[in-house]
């Protein structure tokens, strides 16, 4: 497990993240796809970062590889957020974190990409749980996302 601290993630933030994730989880596949479509809407050039989208004539919203990738990224991001306070750190398996870091490094993912992704994630969650969305919930998810990104960035180096 990564040892990046979950300090500063309060009980209230945890409750907001857990409550919203409980409401979203049954629709994780659909929400994951919406999340990625938002990323590509904001930054169309981001599509070039995904090898499985190159030379594909399948519309993004129907692309099975994108759907699968989007769901796994959305699930990993949300599950990481939910357990942050309890574990006291980002708990993505160490091997996964190393793989994520190496992959993001290899594809040239930069800070701007992480910012676009954060914005798209927060917008996706806001649309998924409009009745409970609040500035506090936005901050809680933003904080959890920032901790995950910091853990990934620590591993952003060539794979060995």
UniProtKB/Swiss-Prot annotation:
Its EC number is 1.7.2.-. InterPro entries: Globin, Globin-like_sf, Globin/Proto, Leghaemoglobin-like, Leghaemoglobin_Fe_BS. It comes from the Eukaryota. Keywords: Cytoplasm, Heme, Iron, Metal-binding, Nitrogen fixation, Nucleus, Oxidoreductase, Oxygen transport, Transport. Belongs to the plant globin family. Homodimer. This is Anaerobic nitrite reductase HBII. It comes from Casuarina glauca.
């Amino acid at each position: 497990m990564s040892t990046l601290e979950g300090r500063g993630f309060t009980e209230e933030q945890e409750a907001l993240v857990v409550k919203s994730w409980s409401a979203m989880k049954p629709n994780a596949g659909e929400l994951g796809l919406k999340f990625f479509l938002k990323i590509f809407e904001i930054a169309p050039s981001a599509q070039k970062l995904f090898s499985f989208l190159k030379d594909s004539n399948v519309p993004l919203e129907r692309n099975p590889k994108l759907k699968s990738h989007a769901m796994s990224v959305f699930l990993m991001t949300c599950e990481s957020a939910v357990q942050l306070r309890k574990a006291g750190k980002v708990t993505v398996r160490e091997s996964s974190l190393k793989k994520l870091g190496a992959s993001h490094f290899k594809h040239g993912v930069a800070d701007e990409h992480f910012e676009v992704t954060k914005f798209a994630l927060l917008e996706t969650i806001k649309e998924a749980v409009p009745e409970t969305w609040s500035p506090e919930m936005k901050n809680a998810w933003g904080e959890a996302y920032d901790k995950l990104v910091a853990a990934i960035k620590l591993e952003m180096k060539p794979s060995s």
